[in-house]
Amino acid sequence: MKAVIFVVDGLGDRPDKNGNTPLKEAKTPVMDRMAKEGICGLMNSVDIGVRPGSDTAHLALLGYDPYTTYTGRGPFEACGVGVTVKPGDIAFRCNFSSVDENFIVTDRRAGRIENTSELEKELDGLKIDDVEIIFKESGGYRAALVLRGPGLSDKITDADPKKEGKKVKEIHPLDDSKEAKKTAEIVNKLLKIAYEKLDKHPVNEERRKQNLPVANMIVPRGVGQVPEIMQFTEKTGLKGACIAGTGLIKGIAKMVGLDVIDVEGCDGTPDSDFMAKACAIVETLENYDFILVNVKGADEAGHDGNYELKKQVIEKVDEMLDYITKNISKDEVYFVLSGDHSTPIEEMDHSADPLPVVLWGKSVRVDDVEKFDEFSTYKGGLNWIKGVHIMPILLDLMGLAKKYGA
């Protein structure tokens, strides 16, 4: 037996005034069929009442307790773009953002700029005092930052104000150590250098001419050091792969030892080649026991407050599932369909609202759920579970779970 965990990033939502969500209103005949043929429930990827990051959520779905393994988003983001994060390195996730001359954020994602490779070159390889700056774009407005040098600490604050109209935050140490103080000073110096180098860069001058938001600032967050983490194959006995479009998910996969399968045209946006990813899933199952799949577009639509786009992305995902389920055997593959977190249209951010989940495959205890959405699956036989329960359930069904006790 093989297994797939298929994550529709940002899937869940809250009902609008008519009681609808993008998922409830979308035409999803395949998701609904899987709900009828599988066992359903609700899932909080991290815990009840906890707003998950995509990082902590995916760790949990892979069977890792995020409360003991998570050290910050930065190391995963850096790993995802090919940077080897060494012990002692300090890593961050960054956004390219638009700011005014007072560092007031006018667009947190720089108009969702598509290509920042030329801007990356302005910062990668810099040296501030005795610290090397490693800076890599991670797709669109996303980037990874690594500080490498002696005497650094991750005990510092983030720069992200999290809202437009607010000033980029000055970095402060979180303890009295000289290492934390030094690291905060280095990052603050870097932010000033970044603005000086990026604001008048030809890429941004051209964007101004086109009346587009400029990418004239980097905003670091999610600071952390490389975690100690058991490899997935050692933990589960499965040979695993990952198919995802974003650096963060690729980084998590690489760090736990999953092989990352790159698919041309799949960049994590609503315009990705969804069917290319579907084909890749079917092909990859021929050589692997397990695949983690992340489809990102619905999350971007949720962050932008775009109800119609989120619904359209979900319908594209349903078309993917149509192809996949027609080309795999239910008797050979267990398939988990859910999200990593809700990204409600009204919030335009992650929320703790639970997600619909269905487990589809042979010998599951089929319940009477007939539709896959936030309101129907709560009646299902899985009841209300956490993300860390998914892998143990799969391993048990696959005959790989170890007995607890005599």
Swiss-Prot record:
Q: Which reaction does it catalyse?
A: (2R)-2-phosphoglycerate = (2R)-3-phosphoglycerate
Pathway assignment: Carbohydrate degradation; glycolysis; pyruvate from D-glyceraldehyde 3-phosphate: step 3/5
Tell me the InterPro entries matching this sequence.
Alkaline_phosphatase_core_sf, ApgAM_prokaryotes, Metalloenzyme, Pglycerate_mutase_ApgM
Q: What is the superkingdom listed in this entry's lineage?
A: Archaea
One GO biological process term? glycolytic process
SUPFAM superfamilies documented for this protein: Alkaline phosphatase-like
- GO molecular function, one example? metal ion binding
Q: What keywords is this UniProt entry annotated with?
A: Glycolysis, Isomerase
E.C. numbers: 5.4.2.12
The family database entries (Pfam families) matched by this protein are listed as: Metalloenzyme, PhosphMutase
Function description? Catalyzes the interconversion of 2-phosphoglycerate and 3-phosphoglycerate.
Family, similarity comment: Belongs to the BPG-independent phosphoglycerate mutase family. A-PGAM subfamily.
Q: What is this protein called?
A: 2,3-bisphosphoglycerate-independent phosphoglycerate mutase
Report the gene name.
apgM
